[in-house]
Amino acid sequence: MTHPLVPPITDLAIPVAEQLGLEVVGIVFHTNQRPPVLRVDIRNPQQDTGLDDCERMSRALEAALDATEIIPDAYVLEVSSPGISRQLVTDREFISFKGFPVIVSTSPPHEGQQEWIGQLIRRDETKVYINQKGRVIEIPRSLITRVLLHDGE
């Protein structure tokens, strides 16, 4: 069942995307998480959808949502592209994709695991922090081989 806020959010998101030369592919509002997660999937009809497209849409939609106050409480906005499989490397990418689902691969294994899946919290000089079902996992950067955006729910 579609969340009741999805239709007004969609009505707001479509013109925002069109102004940026993008299309809204889908919108899902996950209220079973705290804070709730608003996921907006976009595509660029002119070329492969890239990180810059997601960043531009995220900034523009966030401003529009804040101005209208459609969502009354705190939430996390995720803007992505269906099928995007992107390795995060730069500080800018880690900041832009805060709150997004990621897969962190380590070698050797960290605490007995070589792959960690969770929501990206942040990265500092020594660690990457992810939220895994409400638990903060701190993974030493020296062990990390890659951090990828994760498509899975």
UniProtKB/Swiss-Prot annotation:
InterPro entries hit by this protein: Ribosome_maturation_RimP (IPR003728), RimP_C (IPR028998), RimP_C_sf (IPR036847), RimP_N (IPR028989), RimP_N_sf (IPR035956)
Protein's recorded name: Ribosome maturation factor RimP
Domain of life (superkingdom): Bacteria
Record bears the keyword Cytoplasm: yes
Keyword terms, alphabetized: Cytoplasm, Ribosome biogenesis
Family: Belongs to the RimP family.
GO biological process, one term: ribosomal small subunit assembly
Gene3D superfamilies given in the database record: RimP-like superfamily, N-terminal (3.30.300.70)
Gene Ontology annotations for the cellular component aspect, listed alphabetically: cytosol
Gene for this chain: rimP
Location in or out of the cell: Cytoplasm
Described function: Required for maturation of 30S ribosomal subunits.
Organism: Trichormus variabilis (strain ATCC 29413 / PCC 7937)
Family matches, as CDD domains: YlxS_C
